[in-house]
Swiss-Prot record:
Pfam families: Ribosomal_L6. Belongs to the universal ribosomal protein uL6 family. It comes from Agrobacterium fabrum (strain C58 / ATCC 33970) (Agrobacterium tumefaciens (strain C58)). Part of the 50S ribosomal subunit. The keyword Acetylation does not apply. One of its GO terms (biological process) is cytoplasmic translation. This is Large ribosomal subunit protein uL6. One of its GO terms (cellular component) is cytosolic large ribosomal subunit. Keywords: Ribonucleoprotein, Ribosomal protein, RNA-binding, rRNA-binding.
Amino acid sequence: MSRIGKKPVPVPAGVTANVDGQKVTAKGPKGELFFVANDDIQLKLEDNGVSVTPANGTKEARSKWGMSRTMIENIFKGVKDGYERKLEINGVGYRAALQGKNLQLALGFSHDVVYEPPVGITIAVPKPTEIIVSGINKQQVGQVAAEIREYRGPEPYKGKGVKYAEERIVRKEGKKK
């Protein structure tokens, strides 16, 4: 039995939720998102929130139960507060700048890398060594941050590259003579 799935998802203040069959729609101050649950999951809108239950007792239905509840909770938080991910750039000559809506990265290549964010994602560069990716869709924010980090991931010897702000790089010792 899913300990996460048992609890109903509370609808935060300022957010309106609507359940239509397998589709949950949430509208809030930041925008609108929806989640379509699998056929193995039943959704009901109640006074205390959205309750998620497996349609049958199969292992497959139970495995999707907690994940479905968490996805619904994520869309509620996204339309109310939004999500953001911070990235840091370390290295001599490595820097970021905004070029319109596009992100321009100087990462030691012979050319600058230009990244065009998808619709619904905003990128801010408060300092040349700091990037903030924000939006209402948690999965999309994480995906964009991972794509930016992938251009030049942190290396273990000097720690140069793009890393998450909370990430800790395990450093290696160089060659000995």
